[in-house]
């Protein structure tokens, strides 16, 4: 399974477990897959060996996952330092799980 699909699936599961009224109260609005892919496509991929990415409102990590996939598709040997910030403690476990998934997937031979 690709990174973005994994994050999208887990986000859907989270959305189903958290009532819309509660998400609205918390101000939770998650990026759709198509929007994340579009936003990632706007990023200029260079031939750098290392790149640092900051996601200041990471949510479940959809935007980060889309960008990581794009970067790896352009250069599978690139080193990506991803920093995610999220203040909603209800979303943090999903974000951490997906960040760990990304790390494992990118370290596979």
What is the meaning of each model-derived region?
Residues 1-109:
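SAM-dependent methyltransferase catalytic region
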């Amino acid at each position: 399974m690709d990174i973005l699909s994994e994050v999208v699936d887990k986000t859907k599961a989270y959305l189903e477990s958290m009532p819309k009224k509660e998400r609205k109260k918390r101000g939770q609005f998650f990026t759709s897959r198509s929007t994340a892919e579009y936003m990632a496509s706007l990023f200029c991929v260079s031939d750098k060996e290392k790149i640092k990415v900051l996601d200041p409102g990471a949510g479940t990590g959809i935007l980060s996952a889309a960008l990581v996939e794009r970067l790896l598709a352009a250069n599978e040997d690139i080193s990506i330092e991803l920093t995610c910030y999220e203040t909603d403690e209800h979303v943090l476990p999903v974000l951490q799980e997906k960040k760990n998934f990304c790390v494992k997937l990118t370290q596979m031979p």
